[in-house]
Amino acid sequence: MIEQQKRKAPGGPGPGPGPGPGPAPGPGPGPGPAPGAAPGPTPGPDLPLVPSAAKRPRHDPPAAGGGGGGGGGQPPAGALLQSGPPRCSSLQAPIMLLSGHEGEVYCCKFHPNGNTLASAGFDRLILLWNVYGDCDNYATLKGHSGAVMELHYNTDGSMLFSASTDKTVAVWDSETGERVKRLKGHTSFVNSCYPARRGPQLVCTGSDDGTVKLWDIRKKAAVQTFQNTYQVLAVTFNDTSDQIISGGIDNDIKVWDLRQNKLTYTMRGHADSVTGLSLSSEGSYLLSNAMDNTVRIWDVRPFAPKERCVKIFQGNVHNFEKNLLRCSWSPDGSKIAGGSADRFVYVWDTTSRRILYKLPGHAGSVNELAFHPEEPIILSASSDKRLYMGEIQ
């Protein structure tokens, strides 16, 4: 069922209360003008993240000498447009706040075309939003009777998949908002789902019942089931969708072969539960987020060396809330992002392993992050019931 909504993200330049993820993590304000210097028309380095004409005091005295580009000491026409970091996206403002959820937001994804996005969480609702303009919440998808733990669009964006604590996975028509299929078979919470990138529309799921299941949405029951013993918190396919990769509370990442119907190999290294998995766009590398406070990159190509962990990233944290903190790749693979319980948005450079951004703004755990498919925009979903979209360089 689809319901028209009137909720809006606050428009205009301001991001709402609290700073959102800004476009740069640099140092604080620079030094002010020298004593006695008249406030000139050129803005200093200590500018707000969001350029706003309203922030300029109306009683600015004219610059000494009344010169400059405009008469009477006024700044030249268009000077206010320069009053902040240069814009690098088509967002209405460098930071947009999306509020409308009534509970913790666990997951968020951009549509593959980049014009809309979906979010979901504890309130059992899936909200669809416009990325540009006022970021209107234009539709609500209702149908789950439990919290929605993970969302994924299929490759062409025609379908949206949602995994829920109501033990089901729903398949939605992303155009009409209708639920076209409900996949039943798990006996406990479904923590994760992931659709195949190509070929017949398959989807894999992982559950607290300790199983990993493969579904063909043209059929009613699961096509294959793998028994993992321990709760499964995250799943994904490999690039060719002939293997399912799973992570859970046994700390291991397991690769299941669909043709041979067996466990192919196990990747060990994490010292606590694996809460998020993400395959790189070209399919060679796997990203994992775990409760041992590390994010790791693994080589999942066939015939890779036995030690498949190639990089370890640190900075983000998990805590007693035990949220399923996810992770994601930028489209070109140059950056990764990981959820964190310390309320910051973490973005790392994959080559240098350096933290590029540690962005404040959220008042609760940051559960999932998503990179825009075409523009330098990052989306964050948090337990504070909000989402932020922010420009990054």
Predicted ranges, named:
Residues 98-105, 141-148, 184-190, 226-232, ...:
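WD40/WD-repeat beta-propeller blade N-cap
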Residues 108-114, 151-157, 163, 194-200, ...:
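Loop/turn segments within WD40 beta-propeller blades
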Residues 119-123, 162-166, 205-209, 240, ...:
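Conserved strand-to-loop turn within each blade of WD40 beta-propeller repeats
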Residues 126-130, 169-173, 193, 212-216, ...:
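WD40-repeat beta-propellers
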Residues 102, 125-127, 145, 159, ...:
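A conserved positional marker within WD40/Gbeta-like beta-propeller blades
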Residues 1-101:
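Intrinsically disordered terminal extensions that flank WD40 beta-propeller domains
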Residues 370-393:
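Blade-level signature of beta-propeller repeat domains, shared across WD40, Kelch, NHL, RCC1
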Residues 94, 104, 113, 137, ...:
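WD40/WD-repeat beta-propeller blade-loop signature
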